[in-house]
């Protein structure tokens, strides 16, 4: 019997938008090499692997190149699959044991909410190659344990960035967030996320980046709840609520593929 696997578009209500993630439902744990090979075969920004535990699910995330310690859109996709496939009741909380600790998700109508750790940034001096790769003059530069964050002067600057990914790959971090205050109705801020160092030139919609963006924009906008747009080619909407050292990320998802792994 094959292993059930899904492709889910996260942070969108429409197929072919948002960020696609693979979700693999494992009856038993598999070794890292096998999971990495599956992620490479799926060739999505992340593939999630779920294993049932007595008090929830073990959850690991792999890009086509490496395992990562935190991934928002693949967590949203995982929760979506558990509810849609009837593995959890709508009233049940999804509990995920991960490299970033216990993460939870709840269903609120047609929207899912995930409880993630805040990833606050501190002012930082970036490598010269990073600024050359982006060819921008940021108004602020910060860094946390995962990424650099660069605030730029306008939404247009965010949308028109054309990074040199070969140069950007040398940055000693998972990725680079570029953000600005939104000039579009209905959104508080916009961003893009680049992570060539882990095999993803540009991630379409990045939940984990909003664990940094939420606290960052809360301080500047004076708001606990915000609506964010990630301005990639596919685009996606993230609801963000900051609660102390936790960030609640909200969004929708749609399954576009169901299948079986035969290996």
Regions found by a protein language model. Give the residues of each.
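Active-site proximal loop and beta-alpha junction motif in alpha/beta enzyme cores
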Residues: 1-70, 76-263
